[in-house]
Amino acid sequence: MTGRILLLNGPNLNMLGLREPEIYGHATLDDVVELVRARAEHHGLEVDAVQSNHEGDLIDALHRARGTHLGCVLNPGGLTHTSVSLLDAVKASELPTVEVHISNPHARESFRHHSYISPVAAAVIAGAGVDGYGFAVDILANNHLQRTASQ
């Protein structure tokens, strides 16, 4: 299989390994990108990784990926709970998107329980630590194989 996936990480995820390690663990963003690239390579896929603390940058990355990528692994960070614009960009991209959260938002403060992204996500992985990113790649690869086999 060949193709590209977009790895998109939102606000504060550049601080992984430093910010609240008791919640998010000690893995860094570089560790996450390496994990995703290794898992994607196993499936014959390439990865374009983007992290931004700015909502518009994430939206632009989704727009650019439309028609060129087979899916998106998205950890929207705090934008999960606030961003209708990011929701609209996920929809406009027409990419199968797996929403990933390192911690389980439902086991945390009540304001974290709502996700604007989940209703349009192909899958949601929460509470699996950084391993959730690898699971997301597996889901996108398997879904792509199923779609191409049925065409």
From Swiss-Prot:
| Keyword Lyase applies | yes
Which Enzyme Commission number(s) are on file for it? 4.2.1.10
Q: Does the keyword Lyase apply?
A: yes
Q: Which Pfam families match?
A: DHquinase_II
Q: Which reaction does it catalyse?
A: 3-dehydroquinate = 3-dehydroshikimate + H2O
Q: What are its GO biological-process terms?
A: amino acid biosynthetic process; aromatic amino acid family biosynthetic process; chorismate biosynthetic process; quinate catabolic process
- Site positions (Transition state stabilizer) are R19
Locate the active site.
Y24 (proton acceptor), H101 (proton donor)
* Chain sites annotated for binding substrate: N75, H81, D88, I102, S103, R112
Which EC class is the enzyme in?
lyase
Keywords for this protein: Amino-acid biosynthesis, Aromatic amino acid biosynthesis, Lyase
PROSITE patterns, per the entry:
DEHYDROQUINASE_II (PS01029)
Which InterPro entries does the UniProt entry name for this protein?
Answer: DHquinase_II (IPR001874), DHquinase_II_CS (IPR018509), DHquinase_II_sf (IPR036441)
Write down the Gene3D superfamilies for this protein, in alphabetical order.
Dehydroquinase, class II
Q: In which pathway does it act?
A: Metabolic intermediate biosynthesis; chorismate biosynthesis; chorismate from D-erythrose 4-phosphate and phosphoenolpyruvate: step 3/7
Please explain the role this protein plays, according to its UniProt record: Catalyzes a trans-dehydration via an enolate intermediate.
Matching entries from PANTHER family are given as: CATABOLIC 3-DEHYDROQUINASE
| Family, as annotated | Belongs to the type-II 3-dehydroquinase family.
UniProt cross-references to HAMAP family, sorted A to Z: AroQ (MF_00169)
Name the chain's protein. 3-dehydroquinate dehydratase 1
Naturally occurring in which organism (per UniProt): Corynebacterium efficiens (strain DSM 44549 / YS-314 / AJ 12310 / JCM 11189 / NBRC 100395)
Organism lineage reads as: Bacteria, Bacillati, Actinomycetota, Actinomycetes, Mycobacteriales
Please state the gene responsible for encoding this protein: aroQ1
